Amino acid sequence: YKKLGHSRDMALRVYTTRLLGRNSELVLHGGGNTSVKTTVKDLDGKNYDVLCVKGSGWDMAEIEPEGLPAVKLNPLLALKNKKKLSDEEMVAYQKRNLINIKSPNPSVETFLHAFLPFKFVDSTHSDAIMSVTNRPNGITFCKKIFGKKVSIIPYVMPGYGLAQKIKEVYLKNPNINCLILLNHGIFTFSNDAKESYDLMIKYVSDA
């Protein structure tokens, strides 16, 4: 990837995304998202902090750098304290801040990935996790199984509202390294690509 002008950050992100995507027990029906926070140089010669997050239409198992569109990070973070944002406003804002406007639409979970203050964020719809969370007493089971490093969140529809909820949960529990959203899936995060991937495997195995 270096020969093609891509950074080590991007190479690691592509590699671990493929690892997750090729595990059918982790990614149901192609679902899941990954991201990396890094810097890129635009045509104006300036370096921008960006969030490269999986774009719509891309399969994690076969992801390429082009499937992780770069969105300017600071404009995303500028909305951190905004209470509400409609789906239409959210999509338009994300597209407006793409480095390359021809890139695929960024994930509906873009703000969620931006608000978690870690370089690498992984999200999957693991069937093992779902088998625990989808029970009537899912929260109780999750707390027993996963311990204090994991926060359990009742289901919120993916979008800006979920991003705000996860931001609030993380601020109250800054020592966590995993979030489980009932009836949806699991998020792991770290400043190290391997650690974020390993955490995903660990918690799914625990389930």
Which residues fall in each region the model found?
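Glycine-rich flexible loops
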Residues: 1-207
